[in-house]
Amino acid sequence: MSPSDPTPTAPVVEGWLVELGIKPTARVDRDDVVAWDLQLDGRRRFDIRFTVILDPALGLITWVHFAPPIGDGLRKSYQRLLRWNDEFPFVKFSLAEDGRPTLSTEIPFRILDRDELGVALARSLAICDALLEESAGWLWIGGRIPDLAGRVGRNPELFERYASRLPELLGS
């Protein structure tokens, strides 16, 4: 990133992830696009898979693998995703080609920095937590949420750092 070119490079984004206490599980480079796989924890929902995509033609996208492919009555699921799009600003719910519900955030380069990335990740995690009961049927057999008593999340500092920017989701 330079004053004449505000587009962050892959090493800059990797530096932001380190500063946020996040270690990618994989990196994929394809042409000019770089993607990192992450596994993060919400306060209530754990092991949430993300892909962070840096596309020099677009910006940065955080993409949450929200649930496995939907197998129930699709109409009801589509209605739920559309309702969530109305209820949660700044994010978009959609279906991947394989039928998996996804949750994404697009950050244009003009505002992209470490904190915008951190807020996007924290917001997505908080939404996953808020929708835990409603999405349990997609996530676990019989919709039974596993007992997670005593489990500690791997990235609580992310919530602490951005709680003041997400009071409606993080209760600050």
Predicted region positions:
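Charge-rich, low-complexity N-terminal segments
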Residues: M1-D47
